[in-house]
Amino acid sequence: MADDGMLLNFALPSDVIKPQTKIKGGSWRERLSVKKIAARRATNPKRTADGDGNKDGNESGPRNPNRIQVSGSRPAKRQKTDGGFQKLGEGQAHGQGSGQSKGPKKGQGGSVVSSLFSKNPRPRNAVEEDKNDEPMEDAKPTNAPLIDGLDTFTNLGLSPTLAAHLLTKLELKAPTAIQKASITQLLKEETDAFIQAETGSGKTLAYLLPLVQRIMALSRAKNEGDAKGDTSVHRDSGLFAIILAPTRELCKQISVVLEGLLRCAHWIVAGTVIGGEKKKSEKARLRKGLNILVATPGRLADHLENTQALDVSNVRWLVLDEGDRLMELGFEKELQEIISKLDARQRPSRIPGVPAKRATILCSATLKMNVQKLGEISLKDAVHIKADPADEDGEKTAEDKDGDAFRVPAQLKQSYAIVAAKLRLVTLTAFMKRTFMRKGSVMKAIIFVSCADSVNFHFEVFTRKLAEQLEGDNPDEGSDSEHEKEKEKEKPTPASTHGTVAPATAFSNSSNAVTMYKLHGSLPQHVRTSTLSSFAKNRDPSVLICTDVASRGLDLPNVDLVVEYDPAFSADEHLHRIGRTARLGRDGRALVFLLPGCEENYVEILKRGYRDGGKALTRSTTDDILKRGFGGNIESQKWQLELERWALDNPEYLEMARRAYQSHIRAYATHVANERHIFNIKELHLGHLAKSFALRDRPGKINVPGLRPGKEDTKKDFKAERKSAGGKKRKATGYGGGRDDDDDDDRPSATTDTTLAAQKMRAKMKEQLAGASEFNLA
């Protein structure tokens, strides 16, 4: 096309085409943030020029005549700290103290130092509970012994020898209600039985007394039938009774009670076989002969399979203590094997008076009447024995209405506290400080937590050396001699309890020294046994922090207080926890920690355990606990900050805190299904919860130390990878694997899809095992 000589001239304003600045570097989040700031400046240039717009700007309009204009170039104020000066945040620069800061501060390494008392959720029913200020009358104990007197035991059918032994040696003047009902029934008929009663009402003696009485009667029958009259039932006569319990600690306690009973019948021999002990020693005891055997299901099933010296042909009584717990812990397979082998090996006895068939007794405080799970334990025509006469008439109706109902001893004073996640640890410390403030007010207390890692962390927190103790570690010579004298006065702890017993510096004071114990299922068996024995025998103020391993059946003397720092995984387990106190008619107290929000609905479950509808259930406020324990919020904040600095200064304890935090979250997800709407893991504020473990890291930055494979695990994975890929095996040169590890890193061709899948599966199994090990109860 020919040039027509036309000239086009478009004139554009200069502000139409603006230079586009391309943002480079940084992460995509940072680039996006810069873009948003630039867009906001472009849309509102006046606000950005003034800094805060109408707040500090110089726009036209009425102004306060008393206002003094301050230059924006003035530096922020600084607060003097122990190490010098520290720049304050924006909120503190305007006059807010360190204890009243509204927002979190940045610490070292990107950690967050937040205030204890900011942004805490308020309880839903914060004002509803302060209604009943009238003092309540003390309730009549429901698990106390009946009328005193020697005739009460003899009237139940026990021999005068056994009744006199109970009165003189064991100092038991009268039976409890459940003992009266069970002894009468079990001595009268040879049938299977359910024994259900409150915690602390003497269920162990309820089945041991009829058992010992029956075997003592066999001794008399054999003496009468023997011409010489000089022989009786002895250890070679055979095994007559087996008692199964879910935990090793409960087996030990049953064995101690049984040995105390058998002192009046020395010819009857009892023994134990439990996990964690040497099989060789147990087999030696079985070869010598036993009449009564106390065992855990797993170890008994092992001996029935592999020990020929264990003769069960004469077993006529099988007791399942805490039978529902046996099923819950996964012992169903072992119980089926035990029952089938007992049935197959049963033979008619040549001893006169031995029953023709075996009787099975199942006892627990939270026994449910639906026997679908327990039907496989061969219970036939079982008799239900209950202590409360009010329940006998309406037994079916009560169970139909609420099959999960549980009962709390009437004399137990139970309370709950709605505590924000940030304040959990400092509130627990304040409560325990107040509890042991006066000597003699409380002798023993138990703190229940959810997992073993949490036990280890809190044990170190409560037994750590305080700042004033660290300063006094290097005094002059005179104070050194005094310190040595005080050490000489202290009782030495057994070697088997080192690491599980220490002075509780967080609770102790100058007039009342408190000893701290820890117990969980991951400890070696001899350590668990010696720690529990030391706590039971200690007559000074002491605290046991433990998992549910100590919640079932253990009769620990003089326990005045039970604190559920982490709520139980079910209402039944809650009953067993608080049942460690208020035993045999004695008074006791219990406190449950709950979080604001959906956990407040747990109060209705607590009220169901009371006969009066929960009128005796009281509430404790966080402010009151902190005021009584620390004197106020300022001291509480100081204690928390000191604890966080202690964790940062000690990498070992910081890792322990992280383990406890992660394990606590995993344990929180294991509540029973019908209570999961109350303990909803999605409602947890993970950042606030981390502060209760003395952590300043963000939840996403808290790594799980136990899930990373170690050097030996990595070495095994490499060997398995080479084997599955068909590579040649090479010998390892040392501990680190040396050349093998380095060569494998540079050979991607040896890794196949099958090998990668196997590695992922192994890592997943390690993760599951790491989470499950801390809930080990048996």
UniProtKB/Swiss-Prot annotation:
Q: Where is this region: Disordered?
A: 20-144, 470-503, 700-778
The residues that the entry says bind ATP are A197, E198, T199, G200, S201, G202, K203, T204
Skewed-composition ranges (Basic and acidic residues): 47-58, 125-140, 480-492, 709-724
Q: Which residues form the Helicase C-terminal domain?
A: 411-625
Q: By what name is this protein known? A: ATP-dependent RNA helicase dbp7
Q: Which GO terms describe its biological process?
A: endonucleolytic cleavage in ITS1 upstream of 5.8S rRNA from tricistronic rRNA transcript (SSU-rRNA, 5.8S rRNA, LSU-rRNA); ribosome biogenesis
- Entry's localization field: Nucleus, Nucleolus
- At the top level, the lineage of the source is Eukaryota
Q: Give any GO molecular function from the UniProt entry.
A: RNA binding
Q: Where is the composition biased (Polar residues)?
A: 61-72
For bias type Acidic residues, the affected ranges are 470-479
Sequence motif Q motif, location on chain: 151-180
Where does the Helicase ATP-binding domain lie? 184-385
Q: State the domain notes.
A: The Q motif is unique to and characteristic of the DEAD box family of RNA helicases and controls ATP binding and hydrolysis.
- Signal sequence span per UniProt? none
Q: Which InterPro entries match?
A: DEAD/DEAH_box_helicase_dom, Helicase_ATP-bd, Helicase_C-like, P-loop_NTPase, SPB4-like_CTE
What reaction(s) does this enzyme catalyze? ATP + H2O = ADP + phosphate + H(+)
Q: Which UniProt keywords apply?
A: ATP-binding, Helicase, Hydrolase, Nucleotide-binding, Nucleus, Ribosome biogenesis, RNA-binding, rRNA processing
Q: Name one GO cellular component term.
A: nucleus
What's the EC number here?
A: 3.6.4.13
Purpose of the protein: ATP-binding RNA helicase involved in the biogenesis of 60S ribosomal subunits and is required for the normal formation of 25S and 5.8S rRNAs.
Where is the short sequence motif DEAD box located? Answer: 321-324
> Any other noteworthy remark?
Present with 1460 molecules/cell in log phase SD medium.
